[in-house]
Amino acid sequence: MNHDYGRLVSRAALAATLVATLLLIIKIFAWWYTGSVSILAALVDSLVDIAASLTNLLVVRYSLQPADEEHTFGHGKAESLAALAQSMFISGSALFLFLTGIQHLITPEPMRAPLVGIVVTVAALVTTLMLVTFQRWVVRKTRSQAVRADMLHYQSDVMMNGAILVALALSWYGLHRADALFALGIGVWILYSALRMGYEAIQSLLDRALPDDERQAIVDIVAAWPGVRGAHDLRTRQSGPTRFIQLHLEMEDNLPLVQAHLIAEQVEQAILSRFPGSDVIIHQDPCSVVPRFQQGQFEH
């Protein structure tokens, strides 16, 4: 397990939990003071953020545990389960916003002290932007699905806070239904983010192959290696931070077993240099046992 991976994803999960808690406290005060349904929407979203981020923090720590006798491939799939759980949390908050927004659209109420709401929303926007910037950096370094899921819903928070600012400004000028309309729009965006997040989590749980550029990098390494005539049955997937890579190398029939093994070891090390921490399995096939239509067909 890459030590940097564990350190970065743990810090990202902890940072998200602390930020969500701080924003919840601020938004409770702002909603109580202004009565804004848009700020209530943001408050509910912060409650969901805390639940999701706490879940993330616990699951990330569990997923970083090394493989054991019962989980020989490690615990990385826990990250995908966390992302799926987050999508459910967020979908629930979106439905709540729809109901609240419709109620206030039918019976709009004047907002109290919109300036306080604007100040609080600006503070929330800046804080969330800083968190998302940090999370994006962690995702770029680790490709953690759990942190990426967390980042997606905090990105939706940034958009939501921007929409709330506009709604508060319009309400200040007497357009009281704007608050409810923006709450409905925010609900649509949150629901979209949740569905996208759930789709990505399910794809990971179903062992979707690595991205095209990563598979192509593996093909390029193998195709250029001396002594390798071709390859087939390339299979890839990812569980947490670990990439699983399997393939068959095609070699000359008269190649000594020791030399064939050495070539396979060299190819494996080259792949590991490109994708550190991967689990690589390589099988060596004499060219004569590989059907002609299959020779050199990496993905078949």
UniProtKB/Swiss-Prot annotation:
Originating species: Cronobacter sakazakii (strain ATCC BAA-894)
GO cellular component: plasma membrane
Location in or out of the cell: Cell inner membrane
Source organism superkingdom: Bacteria
Protein family: Belongs to the cation diffusion facilitator (CDF) transporter (TC 2.A.4) family. FieF subfamily.
Residues given in the record as Zn(2+) binding sites: D45, D49, H153, D157
Keywords assigned by UniProt, alphabetized: Cell inner membrane, Cell membrane, Ion transport, Iron, Iron transport, Membrane, Metal-binding, Transmembrane, Transmembrane helix, Transport, Zinc, Zinc transport
Catalyzed reactions per annotation: Zn(2+)(in) + H(+)(out) = Zn(2+)(out) + H(+)(in); Cd(2+)(in) + H(+)(out) = Cd(2+)(out) + H(+)(in); Fe(2+)(in) + H(+)(out) = Fe(2+)(out) + H(+)(in)
Entry annotated with the keyword Nucleotide-binding: no
Function text: Divalent metal cation transporter which exports Zn(2+), Cd(2+) and possibly Fe(2+). May be involved in zinc and iron detoxification by efflux.
Lineage: Bacteria, Pseudomonadati, Pseudomonadota, Gammaproteobacteria, Enterobacterales
MF annotations from Gene Ontology: cadmium ion transmembrane transporter activity; ferrous iron transmembrane transporter activity; metal ion binding; zinc efflux antiporter activity
Quaternary structure and partners: Homodimer.
A Gene Ontology BP annotation from the UniProt entry: intracellular zinc ion homeostasis
Topological relation to the membrane, as annotated: Multi-pass membrane protein
Coiled-coil regions listed: none
Protein name as it appears in the record: Cation-efflux pump FieF
UniProt-listed Gene3D superfamilies: Cation efflux protein transmembrane domain, Cation efflux protein, cytoplasmic domain
